[in-house]
UniProtKB/Swiss-Prot annotation:
The lineage of its organism: Bacteria, Pseudomonadati, Pseudomonadota, Gammaproteobacteria, Enterobacterales. GO terms for cellular component: cell outer membrane; pore complex. One of its GO terms (biological process) is monoatomic ion transport. This is Vitamin B12 transporter BtuB. PROSITE patterns: TONB_DEPENDENT_REC_1, TONB_DEPENDENT_REC_2, TONB_DEPENDENT_REC_3. Ca(2+) 2 binds at D213, D215, Y249, D250, D261. Cyanocob(III)alamin binds at S85, N92, V110, S111, T309, R517, Y551. Residues 155-612 form the TBDR beta-barrel domain. A motif (TonB C-terminal box) lies at residues 595-612. Keywords: Calcium, Cell outer membrane, Ion transport, Membrane, Metal-binding, Porin, Signal, TonB box, Transmembrane, Transmembrane beta strand, Transport. Involved in the active translocation of vitamin B12 (cyanocobalamin) across the outer membrane to the periplasmic space. It derives its energy for transport by interacting with the trans-periplasmic membrane protein TonB.
Length: 612
């Protein structure tokens, strides 16, 4: 394990003194610059979600976790397991880089966007979520932000969990972490989740035949990890996980042809790494392999019938990252190598293709008096597009003790994926998307309130979109995004408050039309308190107006705003047994995040966990 105390001492001078007045310990994060540092030293806005948060919210999906976070806007084609997209600060879903333990999530299919409706929430032990450009650190895709899902469990022992809920929801989970001798730790986990679901199509067209069925979801997950400390400075790990998902959905139907209304996703990932953690130097070498097979088929014909579709992707990664404490800060450097291969038929590609990318990056953080400076530069060599460079820089000025002003600028890009280039809907003439972003922010600690207010602008050239008329991907030109984000957290006696407000104006800079499925405004509020050992949580989410397209008439539609309330409670019956209950969408609001696709309405869940 990293010598956290030594690293904190070396970097503590960069930590913002206003946060030091808070009684809560400063969390260490790794996602911002690829080296471990106190969260308060990071100039970009970053949010950390722990497993304790997820259990307290009683979230049954990763999307339910992420929707609570600042800047996140989720559009989903129905309920649990249905296709979804994540927008951060008004950008496309393909502009969100999703990492699993620091490694890019393998994405099968044409869109190039991470669909986290399929990723098991049972695997999530921690999330580090950073907003703003990060291509200078991670390469392609990191235009809107980075979501790093960490699966490493820090809690020893064994836990058994079972839950039931509305729409036939069931969940059974067992996990254990055991010490094998003084220097070896093993972790195992298995999870089963199922829901009968509901009919996801609210209105619109599914062809010549209605499909008034329930669209359910089934997921089975296995996870294993082995960690070993060879000495005080050297350690290694081997880790693997896989999940097998089945999703039923409503699809377009015409008489005499198969109805492709079932999705079957197989995914497996393996990685191994070696770490060196000295007093001033850290180094890590990680290699990984992932393989996903995504079928869409008619159950009457089977997934191997000629009518079925298959998206199959293999991904190979090697990462070597290094950092050294220098002066009042840190310098990091490393290299990434990635190879992605598609099998014939993937994304309607008739032949198999592969794409290779090698990236070199340099990062740095330094404090000079009341000023903190952060920078990064990266060069990517892509087999499809050649060499591409990105950079970013930030500066923070603590002009009064406890109050800081931050200014930042960064460039980023998104390369088209293999399906967008070579698939049936592809366009081999696509150019990479280019982004330039500016942000200014004030933050501080006032009367016990930790707050941050920021304004940002993001200009994206050659943004890739899909044209339903031509059935092709194309570069639609220039997109302009402007926004304001405000966050705060504070305690009033036994009550803990977390609040965020987002106002985003994202539109095509040429036509001045707003981009689809982005809320103009969002308000998110979390209230937590404890009374007689009962832990209560109240969640409020205002989802503002947004625009979409009616794909029957191809006319734009405006969807009104909605206020959603959740209530959760847990009670420890003993020191080992805890029961939990939740009401989601307490007032049973009828709303949509994708036009024509219903949401679940009011739902109840009840669960219990036993630890030993």
């Amino acid at each position: 394990m990293i010598k956290k105390s030594l690293l904190c001492t070396a970097l503590s001078v960069t930590a913002f003194s206003g946060w030091a007045q808070d009684t809560r310990p400063d969390t260490l994060v790794v996602t911002a610059n690829r080296f471990q540092q106190p969260r308060s030293a990071v100039l970009a806005p970053i949010t950390v979600v722990t497993r304790q948060d997820i259990d307290r919210w009683q979230s049954t999906s990763v999307n339910d976790v992420l929707r609570r976070l600042p800047g996140v806007d989720i559009a989903q084609y129905g309920g649990m397991g249905q296709n979804s997209s994540i927008s951060i600060r008004g950008t496309n879903a393909s502009h969100v880089l999703v990492l699993i333990d620091g490694v890019r999530l393998n994405l099968a299919g044409v869109s190039g966007a991470a669909d986290l409706s399929q990723f098991p929430v049972s695997l999530v032990q921690r999330i580090e979520y950073i907003r703003g450009p990060r291509s200078a650190v991670y390469g392609s895709d990191a235009i809107g932000g980075v979501v790093n899902i960490i699966t490493t469990r820090e809690k020893p022992g064994t836990e058994l969990t079972a839950g039931v809920g509305s729409n036939g929801y069931q969940n059974y989970d067992v996990s254990t972490q055991q010490q094998l001798g003084e220097n070896t730790r093993v972790t195992l986990m298995g999870d089963y989740a199922y829901t009968k679901g509901f009919d996801v199509v609210a209105y619109g067209s599914t062809g010549s035949q209605a499909q008034p069925d329930k669209d359910g979801f089934l997921s089975k997950t296995l996870y294993g990890a082995l960690e070993h400390n060879f000495s005080d400075t050297w350690s290694g790990f081997v880790r693997g996980y896989g999940y097998d998902n089945r999703t039923n959905y409503d699809s377009y139907y015409s008489p005499g042809s198969p109805l492709l209304d079932t999705r079957k996703l197989y995914s497996q990932s393996w990685d191994a790494g070696l770490r060196f953690n000295g007093e001033l130097i850290q180094s890590q070498l990680v290699s990984s392999y992932s393989h996903s097979k995504d079928y869409n088929y008619d159950p009457d014909y089977g997934r191997y019938d000629s009518s079925a579709t298959l998206d199959e992707m293999k991904q190979y990664n090697v990462q070597w990252s290094n950092s050294i404490v220098v002066g009042h800060g840190n310098v990091g450097a490393g290299v990434d190598w990635q190879k992605q291969t598609t099998e014939p038929g993937t994304g309607y590609v008739t032949d198999g293709y592969d794409q290779r990318n090698t990236g070199l990056y340099l990062t740095g953080l330094q404090q000079l008096g009341d000023f903190t400076f952060e920078g990064a530069a990266r060069s990517d060599d892509n087999s499809e597009f050649g060499r591409h460079g990105t950079w970013q820089t930030s500066a923070g000025w603590e002009f009064i003790e406890g109050y800081r002003f931050i200014a930042s600028y960064g460039t980023s890009y998104k390369a088209p994926n293999l399906g967008q280039l070579h698939g049936y809907y592809g366009n081999s003439n696509l150019d990479p998307e280019q982004s330039k972003q500016w942000e200014g922010a004030f933050e501080g600690l006032t009367a016990g309130v930790n707050w941050r207010v920021s304004g940002y602008r993001n200009d994206i050239d050659d943004m890739i979109d899909y044209d339903p008329h031509t059935e092709k991907y194309f570069n639609e030109g220039k997109v302009r995004i402007k926004g304001v984000e405000a966050t705060a957290n504070f305690d009033t006696g036994p009550l803990a408050h977390t609040l965020s407000y987002d106002m985003v104006d994202s539109r095509n800079a040429i036509t001045d039309k707003p981009l689809a499925r982005r809320s103009k405004q969002q308000v998110k509020y979390q209230l937590d308190w404890q009374v007689y050992d009962f832990d209560w949580g109240l969640t409020y989410h205002y989802l503002g107006t947004r625009y979409d397209t009616d794909y029957v008439t191809y006319q734009p539609v405006k969807m009104g705003g909605v206020s959603l309330w959740d209530l959760a409670v847990s009670y420890p019956i003993t020191s080992q047994l805890t029961v939990r209950g939740k009401i989601a969408n307490r007032f049973d609001k009828d709303y949509e995040t994708v036009y024509g696709y219903a949401t679940a309405g009011r739902e109840y869940t009840l669960s219990g966990s036993y630890t030993f």
